[in-house]
Swiss-Prot record:
The gene is TIF35. Keywords: Cytoplasm, Initiation factor, Phosphoprotein, Protein biosynthesis, RNA-binding. RNA-binding component of the eukaryotic translation initiation factor 3 (eIF-3) complex, which is involved in protein synthesis of a specialized repertoire of mRNAs and, together with other initiation factors, stimulates binding of mRNA and methionyl-tRNAi to the 40S ribosome. The eIF-3 complex specifically targets and initiates translation of a subset of mRNAs involved in cell proliferation. This subunit can bind 18S rRNA. The modification Phosphoserine is found at S64, S135, S156, S165. GO terms for biological process: formation of cytoplasmic translation initiation complex; translation reinitiation; translational termination. This is Eukaryotic translation initiation factor 3 subunit G. Residues 188-267 form the RRM domain. Its main location: cytoplasm. Pfam families: eIF3g (PF12353), RRM_1 (PF00076). Residues 155-183 are annotated as: Disordered. It is found in: Cytoplasm. Belongs to the eIF-3 subunit G family. InterPro entries: eIF3_g, eIF3g_N, eIF3G_RRM, Nucleotide-bd_a/b_plait_sf, RBD_domain_sf, RRM_dom, Znf_CCHC, Znf_CCHC_sf. One of its GO terms (molecular function) is zinc ion binding.
Length: 269
């Protein structure tokens, strides 16, 4: 039987190697060709970790090479070490939270007379141009009341009946002042229909209108005799922009197993 030739290694242009070897199997000489490519992998580790890997082993592992010995060491998943915050950081966080609570408490001490929302003064109300200053003083000493009273004729004789709108301090409901206010309210009020009977004002505010923190008024229409909801509610928003956004988001949306129908409120004729 002929001798088995020595293995040959051929360097290829692409950096790989072709290894040709021979062996005898069942009286036959077999030629085995293998093509391998060496890939160098560089692992970057922390400097301190690299130093610890050089430490000399002791005990039963004395004299063993670097790295874990699978016969004596069991490898498990890598665990990330999370250090608890220091006492100083905890105290700083508590201090910030207390300061924030203090500021919120100070904001609630004053309420805007224009929109009724706490946190800012009447003179700095962001809804001043929309809501107007119906309760604030107007130009002149007597303000708006004095201007209206001046235009109202007084009773010509004592004992004569004077309508409430023409009495001192009264305002005519058909005047431009009330008309403008109604128009502003209608422009910021939506009519929500097909509401679940169990949805009250608090539920609508907290669950349906949660994206709108400033909702001045929510009124559910109820049966006068039974007090049950008729599935209709009127919602007045802080601005016309908020009302338009709510109309776009809520119309056709499912709420408490019913599909809502939302539209602008219609003034009573």
């Amino acid at each position: 039987m002929s001798e088995v030739p020595e293995p040959r290694i051929i360097e290829n242009p692409d950096g790989s190697k072709t290894i040709i070897s021979f062996k005898i199997d069942g009286g036959k000489k077999l030629k085995i060709t293998q093509r391998v490519k060496e890939i160098k992998i560089t692992e970057k580790v922390n400097k301190s970790i690299a130093e610890r890997r050089k430490w000399a082993k002791y005990g039963a592992e004395a004299g063993s090479g670097p790295g874990p010995n699978l016969s004596t060491t069991k490898l498990a998943e890598e665990l990330q070490l999370r250090l608890a915050p220091s006492l100083k950081e905890v105290r700083e966080q508590d201090s910030k939270e207390k300061e924030k609570e203090k500021q919120e408490g100070e904001k609630s001490l004053y309420v805007c007379r224009t929109c009724g929302i706490p946190g800012h003064f009447t003179t700095k109300c962001p809804f001043r141009d929309i809501l107007g200053e119906m309760s604030g003083p107007a130009e002149g000493e007597g303000g708006l009341d004095a201007a209206v009273d001046t235009a109202m004729p007084a009773a010509s004789a004592p004992g004569k009946y004077v309508p409430p709108s023409r009495r001192a301090g009264g305002r005519d409901p058909s005047s431009d002042v009330y008309k403008d206010q109604r128009e502003r309210d209608d422009a910021m009020t939506l009519k929500i229909m097909q509401l679940n009977e169990n949805a009250d004002e608090m539920t609508i505010k907290q669950k349906l209108l949660s994206p709108f923190p400033n909702v001045p008024r929510v009124a559910v229409v109820r049966n006068k005799e039974t007090g049950r909801s008729r599935g209709i509610a009127y919602v007045t928003f802080a601005s016309e922009k908020d009302a338009e956004t709510a109309l776009r988001l809520l119309h056709g949306r499912g709420f408490m197993n019913l599909i809502l129908q939302v539209d602008w409120s219609k003034p009573k004729k």
